[in-house]
């Protein structure tokens, strides 16, 4: 749904990295490897990395039904 603000496991703020991660790693051109993007953003913990990699942004799909 919405981007999580904090990691569910350790509580580190991860929401601030979503826009940069999305712009660099999730383009259809396949510009950069997601692991390299997360390294550049300083997201080191595995639990925090999975929060960004596994997130599906569905807020635009769900919002008409509210």
Curated annotation (Swiss-Prot):
It is an enzyme of class 2 (transferase). Its EC number is 2.7.7.6. It catalyses: RNA(n) + a ribonucleoside 5'-triphosphate = RNA(n+1) + diphosphate. One of its GO terms (molecular function) is zinc ion binding. Its main location: cytoplasm. Its cofactor is Zn(2+). Binds 1 zinc ion. Zn(2+) binds at residues 7, 10, 47-48. It comes from the Archaea. It holds the Pfam family RNA_pol_N. Keywords: Cytoplasm, DNA-directed RNA polymerase, Metal-binding, Nucleotidyltransferase, Transcription, Transferase, Zinc. GO terms for biological process: DNA-templated transcription. It is found in: Cytoplasm. One of its GO terms (cellular component) is DNA-directed RNA polymerase complex. Belongs to the archaeal Rpo10/eukaryotic RPB10 RNA polymerase subunit family. Part of the RNA polymerase complex. HAMAP family: RNApol_arch_Rpo10. DNA-dependent RNA polymerase (RNAP) catalyzes the transcription of DNA into RNA using the four ribonucleoside triphosphates as substrates. This is DNA-directed RNA polymerase subunit Rpo10. The lineage of its organism: Archaea, Methanobacteriati, Methanobacteriota, Stenosarchaea group, Halobacteria.
């Amino acid at each position: 749904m919405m981007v999580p603000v904090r990691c569910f496991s350790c509580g580190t703020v991860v929401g601030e990295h979503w826009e940069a991660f999305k712009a660099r790693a999730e383009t259809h051109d396949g510009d950069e490897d997601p692991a390299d993007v997360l390294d550049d953003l300083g997201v080191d913990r595995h639990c925090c990395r999975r929060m960004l990699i596994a997130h599906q942004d569905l807020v635009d799909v769900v919002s008409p039904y509210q």
